[in-house]
Amino acid sequence: MSQALDPVWKELREQFPATRDWVYLNSAAGSPVPRVVSEAVNGFYRDLEGGGDRLWEDWLGRVEHVRHQVARFVGAAEPGEIAFVPNTSSGINLIVDLLAGAGPVLSDEMEFPTVTLPWIHRGVHLNMVPSIEGVIRIESFSPEYAPKAATMLLSHVQFVNGCRLDLEQFGAIKAGRHFVVCASQSAGAFPIDVQKAQIDALASAGHKWMCAGYGAGFVYVKRELFEKHPPRAIGWLSVQDPFLFDNLNVRLLPSMRRTEMGCPPFGPIFALGAAVELLAGIGIEKIAERVLYLNEYLTFRLERKGFPVLSPGEGFRSGQTLVEVERPADAVAFLKERKILVTEKPEGIRVATHFFNSEEDCEALVRALGEYSRQPV
């Protein structure tokens, strides 16, 4: 029996109403949210509508519950190593605030601007490793390549072609350097264990593979790093006794909670909690297996129909498939007219298959691309 007919995956697909009307192959840009996520957010706003902030204490308790959930999800040693941020950009900037003075950074030329621009803006020297046929090679990050580098900066999965790195292999060669990871294109699709991979800091959005919607990101910072390089920005909820309102005698929180500063964005945080509960309930290993299966299936079908696939092959696959097509912008518009969502890239279109997708989604794309390729220019 194919995985598409498995009743478990069929039931999970029904959690995503968007799949009724759309062939949704765009989770690398932003995924639709499942019912459990919209219910969590709507429930919060119904409470707010009906009673203002009467549930303030309950909401704060739920925030800490989500912090525990996220910590377990990424393998953090403790919840205090997790902070909530609205997006990856905020998370990376927070990390840069901690490490900008540590020294040069070793990164790669394929990174999304958010990953590198904050370092450059702060005057940090970046050594940019070139890719080799669309792949970031681990030997390029050996200590000998840039002996003065204080930090290794990488994305778990690259946004442009889906190249997925083995974080544990890279962590094993850190050799005293800080290891900073962007996980926006992998969190929710592939396992992450920050301790096993020896990651010092990690940032992720919630609106992509996490299926949590916009505004629900998170950042992990290892306690030792946080204590050695404490953040500078604080607010009224950065202290241990915020309701004393004693501005001259405060005790700062000894955890990453300090960086959240003010009133929490409860809705997005509760959305993230509902998404993590769903993903953890399925099992991230099972999700990864499903994602890779669909990627392999789609790649086979595309290549068989003569569409070149530019994403790296075995050992580097993810949920993204970069397909070479003529006039990518026109192709995206053509597909959207047929209720198929993908993303334009300079070389072609980026297709993202998540666990809620199916073989029929892949077949619909292949058929539509066949129609597009036969259109007169």
Please annotate each region the language model reported.
Residues 1-377:
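Pyridoxal 5′-phosphate
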